[in-house]
């Protein structure tokens, strides 16, 4: 049975999130819907700068900004745009998300991330912004741009069915690494630097490290 099936859905409404505010409906502003929507957050950038290429909000939880970069690369390769801005922003403006993560046991009590440590007990939230400007390499060289790095390949998968919808899968992690290497035409032994997810949990860290070792350990002495 082929399980390599993609799922693509358009999603817009936030009615479920608004349920707790039913009693405060009298204070809802006319522009609140556009101001809170993911699509408007991205669309505003295109609007302000007058960009007319694809303007897409990507939500894949912790991997959102990385998948956004991947999708931007594919859009460039397909000729849908000639330049792309890709990345992500995290601003902690209210305590709600921290409370949710804390109750789910995801946050370290001291707010410090101890990835791949025996003392790992969750991660610490932080604010930041990271954006890259992407172009096809031939276009960047033609235009005399300073090329900082070249993205050789990438891949995206889903865990499928695991012990829980938020539970990771070592098998899926090893698969996405292998597919990315294949797409980049790069041998595991050629990779010298690895940036990990590093959830800082007793459950997630060993799984991620094991997946990375099972792929990148091949061909190494």
Language model: regions and residue ranges:
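Condensing-enzyme catalytic core of the thiolase-fold
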Residues: 1-221
């Amino acid at each position: 049975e082929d399980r390599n099936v993609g799922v693509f859905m358009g999603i817009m409404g936030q009615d479920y999130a608004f349920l707790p505010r039913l009693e405060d409906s009298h204070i809802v502003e006319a522009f609140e819907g556009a101001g809170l929507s993911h699509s408007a957050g991205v669309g505003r950038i295109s609007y302000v700068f007058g960009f007319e290429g694809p303007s897409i909000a990507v939500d894949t939880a912790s991997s959102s900004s990385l998948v956004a970069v991947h999708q931007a690369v594919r859009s460039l390769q397909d000729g849908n745009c000639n330049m792309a801005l890709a990345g992500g922003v995290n601003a902690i403006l209210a305590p709600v998300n921290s409370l949710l993560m804390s109750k789910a046991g995801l946050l370290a009590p001291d707010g410090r991330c101890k990835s791949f440590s025996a003392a790992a007990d969750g991660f610490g939230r932080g604010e930041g912004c990271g954006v890259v400007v992407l172009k096809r390499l031939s276009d960047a060289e033609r235009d005399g741009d300073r090329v900082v790095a070249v993205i050789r390949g990438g891949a995206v998968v889903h865990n499928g069915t695991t012990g829980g919808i938020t539970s990771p899968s070592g098998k899926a992690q090893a698969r996405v690494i292998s597919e990315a290497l294949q797409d980049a035409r790069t041998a595991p032994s050629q990779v010298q630097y690895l940036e990990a997810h590093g959830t800082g949990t007793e459950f997630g860290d060993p799984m991620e490290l094991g997946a990375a070792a099972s792929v990148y350990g091949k061909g190494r002495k």
